[in-house]
Regions:
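Glycine-centered loop-to-beta-strand initiation motif
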Residues: 99-107
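Mid-length scaffold segments of soluble, non-membrane domains
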Residues: 43-93
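Short Pro-Gly-centered beta-turn/loop motif in secreted/extracellular proteins
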Residues: 106-114
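Hydrophobic beta-strand positions
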Residues: 31, 83-84, 98, 118-119
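A short, solvent-exposed beta-strand micro-motif common in secreted/extracellular proteins
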Residues: 113-122
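Extracytoplasmic low-complexity, Pro/Thr/Ser/Ala/Gly-rich segments
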Residues: 1-37
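Extracellular beta-sheet/turn segments enriched in Thr/Pro/Gly and aliphatic residues
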Residues: 41-43, 48-55, 133-147
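Surface-exposed loop/edge segments in extracytoplasmic proteins
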Residues: 88-96, 125-129
């Protein structure tokens, strides 16, 4: 499952096709072909995949990530990502990552927690809250404006 999700999110923009659309919710990945035939694959019961697109000036509204449709501003950019459990203060993610060609960085989080996420790029930082508590939790975070 992880490999499928990460492969979909890493599709280079030039390789995107209009014959496949995808969506990632907190519960499953849905792949739909040009004939509207859909295949659903459940996500792990203990994890949720969240795609985050930090930005400076341009973003889009999104709640459920579409690896074949969403486009973030900072493509192939180095970012520092820190995710902290808002209740315990435990650091869940503390990594130097690179945004994908679509401008997003993908993060696997444990289910059932409230977190604080911080992303830094070129000396600018954005911070947000993110929840993996509900079955309809957000999987696309596009509101992290770097300042």
């Amino acid at each position: 499952m992880r490999e499928l999700v990460e492969t979909l999110d890493a599709i280079p923009l030039d390789d995107r096709t209009e014959t496949l659309t995808t969506s990632i919710t907190a519960e499953m990945v849905t792949l739909t072909d040009q004939h509207e035939h859909a295949t659903e694959v459940r996500l792990p019961s203990d994890e949720i995949y969240v795609s985050v697109a930090p930005y400076r000036s341009q973003t889009h509204d999104c709640y459920y990530h579409s690896p074949t449709g969403c486009l973030g501003e900072l493509r192939n950019a180095d970012v520092a990502v820190t995710v902290t459990d808002a209740t315990t203060g435990e650091t869940i993610v503390d990594e130097e990552l690179r945004t994908l060609d679509n401008g997003f960085v993908g993060i696997w989080l444990p289910r059932g927690i409230e977190t604080s996420i911080s992303i830094t790029h070129d000396g600018q930082t954005a911070t947000s809250k993110l929840s993996s508590v509900d079955d309809d939790a957000q999987t696309c975070l596009t509101t992290m404006r770097l300042a």
